[in-house]
Amino acid sequence: GEELKAKFNPENGQIELFLSGEPEPDPEPDACIEDATTLCLQHDKFNVSVTWRDFQDRTGSGRATELSSESGDFWFFNAQSNELIVKVIDACTSTGNYWVFWRALSNVEMDLVIRNTATLQTLTYHNPLGYNSNGHLDIDTIFRCDGSGPATASFDTRTDLPAPGTPQLEEF
């Protein structure tokens, strides 16, 4: 027979009930929680973080500094030396999507991850060790203003092609 299941929803503090034969409730949008390693841009619509690896194989998370509601930067080794700057622009009225602009000021390996907190879409840009990206101006992101588009996408900054090992994009 069917079984009654429960799932806690941290957004509203409620316990949601459903039958085992029914699909689980859709996940609630994530709230963007700004902390030392996370930027919340476009009024908390986008969660932005970066991880890095240097030439001595040391790893870490970039330390975030918000510059405005649409931009911020990250430092890796010294708070006085920015390593990455990121901007997310609301271009909904002109192109129907959000634009992502960023520039690395370092040649360490890094993975920049931008997540839409409403749709849970995730966009990752990978910069390989030893490569200094000349910047990235992405005006055709997966972040459509109507919430459509793939759930995930990953790009290698050397080619702007999907990163090796990236699965086929799935519609969200």
Residue map of PLM features:
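Polar/charged low-complexity regulatory segments
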Residues: 3-172
